[in-house]
Amino acid sequence: MRFMISVKGMPCFVFLKKFPTFLREYAEIRAQAEKMGKDFPFAKLYPCLEERNEESGGGAEHYFLQDLLVAQKIFQMNRLSRHVDIGSRIDGFVGHVASFREVEVFDVRGQNFDIANIHFAMADLTAEDFSFVDYCDSLSCLHAMEHFGLGRYGNRLNYRDHLVGRDNMFRRLKQGGKFYFSVPIGEQRIEFNAHRVFSVAYLLRFMEGRYDIDSFSYVDNKNRLITNAVLDERSVGNNFGCHYGCGIFELTKR
């Protein structure tokens, strides 16, 4: 018998702890199949070991919460003429927006699909000669800028590429345009090659003189969404108590 196991992205201790239960249950259902018929033949093993004790749907996560919040804000501002997204999730935020308006998506990674209301272009937002100046009046970049310059998705290694990306996005947006922006927040650091984590104080300096902050929301360490948070000195100083949270800014270009 050919015995192939596919386990992807799973910590070793999880595998060692939960795999015996998986094998026991596999033997049990094989025995049931022998007695009840073999309408479904068994193929390779595909263990899913981490989901048994999770809440249904996995909804309370950074992406799920930010995607819904920002899509709702764009829906309320639907009078804006051209929305462009930079690197956000196609199967989350972009899909939400495409349900009620057209959206242009720019990403360093390629895509092969044809979906109504989504227009894709492969582009590197950290290119020094990036064009499209004053191109749109609505722009989003959700949980993407933290990857700039770290090579995770085939992009170049450059310690300061988040600054290049910031400048290119600023040039792309028209004056008075809306910018919806999110990144991980907490003590400032790089966890190579996954992502950067930004302190809130750094982000405020990062945007100073470029944008007015219309609202700030965040997802905390317990995956709770707090909307319209006040950016007071104490909260900014301790990153709203986050080690790895998600800061979500609604901005207007000056």
What is each PLM-predicted segment?
Residues 1-82, 93, 192-210, 214-250, ...:
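N-terminal accessory regions of S-adenosyl-L-methionine
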Residues 59, 150-162, 190-195:
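Short, flexible/disordered intra-domain loops and linkers
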Residues 128-139:
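A short acidic, Gly/Pro-enriched loop at the edge of an enzyme's catalytic core
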Residues 140-145, 149:
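A conserved beta-strand element that flanks and buttresses the S-adenosyl-L-methionine
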Residues 176-184:
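Conserved beta-strand signature within the Rossmann-like core of class I S-adenosyl-L-methionine
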Residues 157-175:
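A short glycine-rich, Lys/Arg-flanked "PGG" loop and its adjoining helix->strand segment in the class I
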Residues 82-130:
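Class I SAM-dependent methyltransferase SAM/SAH-binding core
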Residues 77, 96-98, 174:
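Short, conserved loop/helix-junction motifs that constitute active-site signature segments
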